[in-house]
Structures are given as structure tokens and as C-alpha cells.
Amino acid sequence: MSSWPPRVVIRRSAGLRTMESALARTGLGPVAGVDEAGRGACAGPLVIAACVLAPKPQAALARLDDSKKLTERAREELFPAIKRLALAWSVVSVPAAEVDQIGIHVANIEGMRRAVAGLDLEPGYVLTDGFRVPGLTAPSLPVIGGDGAAACIAAASVLAKVTRDRVMTEMDETHPGYGFAIHKGYSTPLHMDALDELGPCPEHRMTYANVVAAGVRLEQRAGRTG
């Protein structure tokens, strides 16, 4: 008897290419990796990327790793190289208002589906970072710490992170005072102090507890001085 998809045997091999190599050996390529940026932020979009790399490792991508472990300069250097050398890539942005409407987990799953659907080629297998994504058109596997374990997920993490960081830097100009270019919408002390002083802006996730609390405190102060 045969089964589909075939059983994948992960052998000890070179670094981040282990999973993709194992899947390719069983005829399940091309392999797409999917990752997000901004899940833990309280402002700005959730950005999701999908990426399919060529089977043969390329020198320009040798420094690929989890985007959070890379310096900003390294990410910026890898970003155009990934887009140039990848067989296919796709980036999806889910705005803060949609995150509020459907919730961060659903937004993450739906964004991953959209990113995979946006690829210029149909993947034979999809590796996702951290959790299962139902509704994909290809077999998939959630990989804990995937952005540090599979090159295609690491590439997707860089695409998502750099794209989102640039969006947040631009947002700092349209919504000055919050420091978005510095903290990228995450709940740092600098951001929380600005949120307390200014109240939420349209790019904040209005259903998040700390954003709600800041809005309430601002209204209370306005009531006392009104």
C-alpha cells in the first residue's frame, strides 16, 4: 500500500535547508515557508509573507536566519536578495482595523492563506512558523521556531519584518508623537507613555486591553479638566 503524502524522513544535513531537502527528496517540492511580523504589536498592521527558495543554496542568502536574530542592516541587505533570488514570494498586510474585527489569530491564519495563494507558483508543501494553518491548497507542517529551522520560513520572516518596519517608519510621519519608527508599534515604555499622553490613533488596535485602557484614562483626564 502507498500513502500520500509520502512519509518524510528528516536527516542530519546542512542547517536551515534540512526540512526543504527532506521534502524535496520525497517529491513534495517546491516548498513554501510562511511567517508573520507584528503579531505582538498593539499598533500597525499584521504583515505575512510566503517564500519559495531555489533548491540549491545561494551565497547571497548564506546569512539567512530568524529575522529577530538579525541586525536591521543584515535584514535590509537580505531583503532585495531574497526577492531577486526566490522562485516566488508574496507579502500580505492585514490592517489594524481588520485585526480588531476578526481577532489576531484568525487574521494570522487568513493572512497566511492569502500569502500562499499570492505566490506565482503552486507549492507542493508549506512550512508554517509555529502553528497549523487549515485551508491551504497544499499539505503543510507547523514548525516550532520555524524561522530559525527552515530557510524558506527564515526568508519569509525577513520579507515580513522589513516590509512592516518600513510601514511603521512611514506611519511615524503621518502619526507623529508615538515613536512608531523606534518601537514599530510594540508595547515598549516609550510607546505606552506616548499612548497615555496622546490617546490612541487610527492605527492602534482598538480592541487591545492596553489601548482601551489608555483611551479610558485620556477620557477621564479630559473629564476632570472639562
Curated annotation (Swiss-Prot):
Annotated ranges, domain RNase H type-2: 29-220
Organism domain of life: Bacteria
KW Cell membrane (keyword) present: no
Principal location: cytoplasm
Keyword annotations from UniProtKB, A to Z: Cytoplasm, Endonuclease, Hydrolase, Manganese, Metal-binding, Nuclease
GO (cellular component) term, any one: cytoplasm
Binding site for a divalent metal cation: D35, E36, D129
Cofactors, names only: Mn(2+); Mg(2+)
Record field: catalytic activity: Endonucleolytic cleavage to 5'-phosphomonoester
GO molecular function, one term: manganese ion binding
UniProt KW Metal-binding keyword: yes
Cell location: Cytoplasm
E.C. numbers: 3.1.26.4
One Gene Ontology term from the biological process aspect of the record: DNA replication, removal of RNA primer
Cofactor binding note: Manganese or magnesium. Binds 1 divalent metal ion per monomer in the absence of substrate. May bind a second metal ion after substrate binding.
Cited InterPro entries: RNase_HII, RNase_HII/HIII, RNase_HII/HIII_dom, RNaseH-like_sf, RNaseH_sf
Homology family: Belongs to the RNase HII family.
Function of the protein: Endonuclease that specifically degrades the RNA of RNA-DNA hybrids.
Entry protein name: Ribonuclease HII
